[in-house]
Design a protein with these regions (language model features):
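C-terminal substrate-recognition "lid" of short-chain dehydrogenase/reductases
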Residues: 215-244
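Catalytic Tyr-X3-Lys loop
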Residues: 82, 98-117, 139, 164, ...
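Conserved glycine-rich cofactor-binding loop
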Residues: 11-12
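Catalytic loop of short-chain dehydrogenase/reductase
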Residues: 90, 133, 139-163, 168-177
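Active-site Tyr-X3-Lys motif and surrounding loop/helix of classical short-chain dehydrogenase/reductase
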Residues: 69-76, 95-99, 103-110, 206
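Short, small/polar-rich loop/turn modules that mediate ligand/substrate recognition or access, typified
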Residues: 176, 181, 237-239
Length: 248
C-alpha cells in the first residue's frame, strides 16, 4: 500500500484519532497542525512507534501561502498525495448572532471554510486524472450542527459547516469522473477539546441526555467512519454526508 494521507488539524481530537487509525491501516500520514507542535509530534511518535510512517507539518490552512508550502513539502518528501481529511476547524465562545463581531465571523469562516477549499483545491490538483494523478479520496469533517443550527451558541460555526456540506456535494460531482471520491462525516456530540475551546467544557456531559444513544461519542468512533470512507471498501461511495451523531 502506498497511500499518502494529509490530515489537517491532526494534532488533537478527531484529527489525531484519524491519523493514528489510518497509519495502522497502512497509510503514510502527514499530520498538519496550526500551533501545537508538541501535540502533533506526539501523534507522529505514536505512529512511528507502531511501525508507521508520519511527519508533522505546520501550516495555517486559512493562509494560502502556507497551504501551498505545505503541499509542496508533501510533494518533495512523500510524493503525490492520494488522500485528504479536511479536519482543521475552530469554534468560538457561545453567542447570539446579534452579538457576533466581524473579526469572529472572519476567523470562523476563514479556517473552517476557506481552509477546506484551499486544501481540497491543492489535493484535486494532485489526485485528479485530469492533471495526471492517480485518483484519490477526500473526506471533509462537517458537523451535525450544519442541520441543527446551534442557536444562541454557534450559528456561525453551524453555517460554516453547512458550507462544507455543499463543498462536499458539489466537488464530488465535479471530480467524480476524475478518479476522486469526496464525502463528509457529520460528527454530533463528540468528547474532544473543541468544547472547552468554545467555552463549554462540560457540554458533552450536559447534553448527552438529548442523544438517543444517551451518550457522547469518541474521536475514535468518528475516525472509524472517516477511514472507511477513504478506503477501497467505500469505492462506490461519493457525495455522502455520513452522520456519526448517535441519532441526534
Amino acid at each position: 500500500m502506498d497511500e499518502i494521507l494529509l490530515v489537517t488539524g491532526g494534532s488533537r481530537g478527531i484529527g489525531a484519532a484519524t491519523a493514528l487509525l489510518a497509519a495502522r491501516k497502512g497509510y503514510r500520514v502527514v499530520v498538519n497542525y496550526a500551533s501545537n507542535e508538541a501535540a502533533a509530534q506526539e501523534v507522529v511518535r505514536a505512529i512511528r512507534a507502531g511501525g508507521g510512517t508520519a511527519a508533522a507539518i505546520q501550516a495555517d490552512v486559512a493562509d494560502e501561502g502556507q497551504v501551498l508550502a505545505m503541499f509542496a513539502r508533501i510533494d518533495q518528501e512523500f510524493g503525490r498525495l492520494t488522500a485528504l481529511v479536511n479536519n482543521a476547524g475552530v469554534v468560538d465562545q457561545p453567542q447570539r448572532v446579534d452579538e457576533m463581531s466581524l473579526q469572529r465571523l472572519k476567523r470562523i469562516f476563514d479556517i473552517n471554510v476557506i481552509g477546506s477549499f484551499l486544501c481540497a483545491r491543492e489535493a484535486v490538483r494532485r489526485m485528479s486524472t485530469r492533471h495526471g494523478g492517480p485518483g484519490g479520496a477526500i473526506v471533509n469533517v462537517s458537523s451535525a450542527a450544519s442541520r441543527l443550527g446551534s442557536p444562541a451558541q454557534y450559528v456561525d460555526y453551524a453555517a460554516a459547516k453547512g458550507a462544507i456540506d455543499v463543498l462536499t456535494q458539489g466537488l464530488a460531482k465535479e471530480v467524480g469522473g476524475e478518479g476522486i471520491r469526496v464525502n463528509a462525516v457529520r460528527p454530533g456530540l463528540i468528547d474532544t477539546e473543541i468544547h472547552a475551546s468554545g467555552g463549554l467544557p462540560d457540554r458533552v456531559k450536559e447534553l448527552a441526555h438529548l442523544v438517543p444513544m444517551q451518550r457522547g461519542g469518541s474521536a475514535e468512533e468518528v475516525a472509524q467512519a472517516i477511514v472507511w470512507l477513504l478506503s477501497p471498501e467505500a469505492s462506490y461511495t461519493t457525495m455522502s454526508l455520513v452522520e456519526v451523531s448517535g441519532g441526534r
